[in-house]
Amino acid sequence: MACLSRIFLILMITMSSSSPPFCSGGSRKELRDKEITSKSDDTQASYVLGSKFVDPTRVLQLSWLPRVFLYRGFLSEEECDHLISLRKETTEVYSVDADGKTQLDPVVAGIEEKVSAWTFLPGENGGSIKVRSYTSEKSGKKLDYFGEEPSSVLHESLLATVVLYLSNTTQGGELLFPNSEMKPKNSCLEGGNILRPVKGNAILFFTRLLNASLDGKSTHLRCPVVKGELLVATKLIYAKKQARIEESGECSDEDENCGRWAKLGECKKNPVYMIGSPDYYGTCRKSCNAC
């Protein structure tokens, strides 16, 4: 009887070892499928948002007075093309969701995170990314990246500027710092400017010294675009947090008297309080039609 029991036990062990491990195999297959799905999701996220990591080997310090830095290949080809597809002349690049609210485009959000990582400045201190196009300009003008003529008013809280090149140009469009220590490229007539527009490159320059005082050497100008088209995105970074109500789609007044004040002309008489400034979020933006 003991012999039969021993034989039965041997048969059971043999059958167990020869049977295909359905559960084990299924688990491995399920795990493998999860890994493939995870990799696919990571690839998709990487394509949508782009790389948020900063590669210090691509960064060159071009000047200390003022502080000017060049990042080669800051944006990918896809990111440049995406910004171009979203652009509206002199306006922020946003998208609108199903509810009609204005939201920051995911690719733009990724770019802004990378800008913050590169500059070591909080993202909340930055203004919206703006995209502009320049073609066939008069060579006698001194231009900048914030309009047709160089701005004569410097925001008191402006700390730094990031210029993102979205295209190459056949001729022109270089960025110059006439008062900087960079030599000798101080003229649009000189060739070989390292700050010439190259698609994907980014330039960071500070308008303040390390002690927070204004850097007079940060005065800059842009060479006119003689041939081709220049597409460029700019982002201003301030010393203080910037209110960007557009992200939530809200537009409201903070005082019940705003409507009456607006009718009395206070929007023009007292624009800082009513509409706002880089340092102050306006109290009556809705009544002043500022949003």
Swiss-Prot record:
Residues 1-156 are cytoplasmic. The chain crosses the membrane at residues 157-173. It catalyses: L-prolyl-[collagen] + 2-oxoglutarate + O2 = trans-4-hydroxy-L-prolyl-[collagen] + succinate + CO2. Fe cation binds at residues 142, 144, 220. SMART domains: P4Hc, ShKT. It is found in: Endoplasmic reticulum membrane. It comes from the Eukaryota. Gene3D superfamilies: q2cbj1_9rhob like domain. Disulfide bonds join 251-291, 258-284, 267-288. Belongs to the P4HA family. PANTHER family: PROLYL 4-HYDROXYLASE 12-RELATED (PTHR10869:SF102), PROLYL 4-HYDROXYLASE ALPHA SUBUNIT (PTHR10869). This is Probable prolyl 4-hydroxylase 12.
